[in-house]
């Protein structure tokens, strides 16, 4: 191959790469537009049934994030995975509506800034500490991890319990047996089912890993990674506190 031919081959490859990059960027923009449209439709459908929630429903900007599953919020922005959100909406738009309202309720009840009430209810090591025997670091970490998981679960159950009790067309959905039984046990306490109360009740159940995982799967709706409470070193967001 001569010098001219090699130069032409390189230039052709560069042009192809530029075209592919432009096409990928265009496709990403189209996916982001579609995701934003879906969330806007969810907001509008919820508004027509819950006009008193107007301000809360309209308090977000929407941003694509392929690292999230399927969506999540930090109180300012709703992040969404375009394919997962699109798939959810295609499966049934009610699921997307419920997800939107679920995230709004996390903000309204300030789940996004609250930290787990504590790990003591999930650790037998406390008894050892009280007797002057220090807990092992690994055991402490397991207790903290379980407390965090149960707190996330408690926040999700609190939001879902409200949504399931709405009986409004945009969010009406059949409940599984596990969900019905979970509500029945929690309601038996006779207390208002806020996240703190649910957390306290879950601690009494002595959940096995399998039982906890089943409940997490049943009530999982959104990704909590952007919650202020997930980063202990993050300073309080005054704008967020004033907003919610």
Task: Annotate each PLM feature.
Residues 2-14, 18-97, 104-244:
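Short, functionally important secondary-structure microenvironments
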